Amino acid sequence: KNANAISVQRINECDERKATNHVNKSIIKSNENIDYTIYVSNWIQEIFVKQGLEKIDSSVILGGANKKHFNTENKKFWDGNYPIKLVTHHWSSNWMKGFDSYKEIDEILNSNIWKEKLEFTYIGNLPKDFKFKNVKTILPLEEKELGEELKKHDIYITGSINEPSGNHHIEAAQCGLPILYINSGG
């Protein structure tokens, strides 16, 4: 530690997120000389406290999205007169972002019954060699365009597993979309 400086570490990553086995040890090691630790969720704080980091001199600061772009302005809400428009978005192409769930929805949409009731849009990067058959895909978008695109949809889904604190569901909620999620992570 440097007596002339205060060091702060923000912890937003863990092995549980991407099924690795070295990230937590590295973070704990780097935290040895830190004066104060900020966690992005209670969930990730609990992981590191259980692995030996002190809860003293730490806090949780939750994230938020830019209200200029992620809001309900010009949002048209579903009136029941067209298929429900389901959407998700992820920058990362990691499978744990929910691709097992999204693949299942894609397969359900093979049925004409569901095609008449539901549309699904995926915004972002896909895992290598992964392709949807029945899902509209859009490359990653900048904040303004992303907010506009989210507002064209009715329901947001996130299948993310062990996400410490994703921004994706926060952005969607601020756009007025109800969220379907797996009870996993922070």
PLM regions and their residue ranges:
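Acidic anion/phosphate-binding donor-loop and adjacent secondary structure
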Residues: 19-21, 49, 64-82
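Nucleotide-activated donor-binding/catalytic signature segment of Leloir-type glycosyltransferases, i.e.
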Residues: 124-147, 155
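Aromatic "clamp/platform" in nucleotide-sugar-dependent glycosyltransferases that forms part
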Residues: 161
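Conserved donor-binding/catalytic core segment of Leloir-type glycosyltransferases
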Residues: 76-109
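A short, active-site helix/loop in glycosyltransferases that binds the activated sugar's phosphate group
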Residues: 32-57, 65-69
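Short hydrophobic beta-strand element within catalytic cores of glycosyltransferases
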Residues: 178-181
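Short alpha-helical segment that forms part of, or immediately flanks, the ligand-binding pocket
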Residues: 147, 170-174
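Active-site proximal beta-strand in glycosyltransferases
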Residues: 2-18, 38
